């Protein structure tokens, strides 16, 4: 509750649960509060990796506009666009300023960072790169860095992508001289884009970026993405009583939760899934008024909100038109 006000009790489960489930529910609730901007008490509670988890940063991400394969092939032929591999991680902002490393999620809220990654960021600072901001995908044990927003205290957001990427080239050269290149990886520009090859070899997709496109918040026609399979954020409705699977649902235009089938809960999931969790699933297509076809669990999304689990994000199977 609010500091200085009375605490409020709220029953989280209708019946007793195991310690494992209770711990998972606690962690989920804690992350939701931090995601919404709450911080811990000054009386001594701390957060692993950062003392201000959940605090708002100045990160406002440039998001990719989805396109189909026809549009992608047009962009491949357009000399005003370049391409990069799209990696399936979690959006991560990295800033180094005044000797401090800050990480933020897609919502712009500060999150913890792994010690190994912090050391790699500090290595760059020791090589003479100061006051920089990187835009990355967090792959768990390493980062895929695809853009740079500032360096040496100079804001690059108003520069074109090609000019920004030149600064990443200098960083890549420094990283190659050490083991830190395996932790902070630079997403290269593709000189040739073979969609069939990328699809056949299991890549998530490809991004297209206008060479003179500035870095802006939100989506525009300067950055596109083509994904080789569909991805959706859904909410866990319930767990199956006897199988390792969960029922999943999305929010429709009437603000009602609608079931879209079940997905298997893998054995290596970071923690047991519980009702109310937001997760990403991959699928081939969705049936109108039905379920997702061949969904597979991708990852837990503690960085998103329920308003991100919308039915409007689903890609539905095309149906034959009546003659």
Which residue stretches match the model-derived regions?
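Conserved, charged/glycine-enriched, solvent-exposed linker/hinge segments
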Residues: 42-82
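Generic, well-ordered alpha-helical scaffold segments in large soluble proteins
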Residues: 25-32, 170-174, 201
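Covalent nucleotidyltransferase
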Residues: 72-178
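Nucleic-acid 5′ end/cap handling module spanning
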Residues: 65-108, 176-303, 323
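Intrinsically disordered, low-complexity regulatory tails
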Residues: 1-48, 142-156, 160, 254-323
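Short glycine-rich, low-complexity/disordered patches
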Residues: 36-46, 131-136, 177-188
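TOPRIM metal-binding catalytic domain and adjacent DNA-binding surface shared by DnaG-type primases
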Residues: 53-59, 144, 150, 171-190
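A short, polar/proline- and glycine-enriched secondary-structure boundary/capping micro-motif
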Residues: 4-11, 110-116, 247
């Amino acid at each position: 509750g609010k500091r200085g006000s009375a605490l409020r009790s709220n029953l989280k489960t209708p019946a007793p649960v195991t310690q494992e489930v209770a711990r998972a529910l606690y962690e989920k609730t804690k992350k939701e509060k931090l995601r919404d901007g709450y911080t811990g008490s000054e009386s001594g509670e701390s957060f692993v990796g950062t003392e201000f988890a959940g605090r708002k940063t100045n990160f406002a991400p440039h998001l990719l506009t989805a396109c189909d394969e026809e549009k992608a092939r047009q962009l491949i032929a357009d000399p005003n666009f370049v391409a990069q591999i799209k990696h399936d991680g979690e959006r991560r902002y990295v800033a180094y300023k005044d000797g401090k490393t800050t990480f933020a999620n897609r919502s712009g809220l500060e999150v913890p960072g792994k010690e190994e990654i912090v050391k790699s960021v500090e290595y760059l600072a020791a090589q003479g790169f100061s006051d920089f901001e990187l835009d990355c995908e967090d792959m768990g044990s390493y980062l895929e860095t695809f853009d740079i927003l500032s360096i040496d205290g100079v804001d690059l957001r108003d520069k074109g992508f090609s000019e920004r990427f030149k600064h990443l080239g200098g960083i890549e050269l420094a990283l190659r001289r050490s083991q830190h290149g395996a932790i902070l990886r630079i997403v290269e520009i593709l000189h040739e884009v073979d969609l069939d090859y990328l699809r056949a070899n299991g890549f998530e997709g490809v991004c297209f970026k206008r060479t003179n496109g500035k870095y802006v918040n939100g989506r525009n026609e300067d950055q596109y993405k083509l994904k080789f399979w569909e991805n959706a954020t859904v909410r866990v409705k319930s767990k199956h009583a006897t199988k390792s699977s969960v029922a999943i649902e999305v929010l429709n235009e009437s603000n009602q939760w609608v079931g879209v089938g079940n997905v298997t809960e893998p054995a290596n999931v970071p923690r047991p899934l519980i009702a109310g969790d937001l997760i990403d699933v991959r699928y081939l297509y969705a049936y109108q008024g039905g379920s997702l076809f061949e969904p597979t669990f991708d990852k837990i999304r503690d960085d998103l909100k329920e308003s991100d689990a919308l039915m409007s994000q689903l890609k539905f199977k095309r149906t034959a038109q009546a003659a």
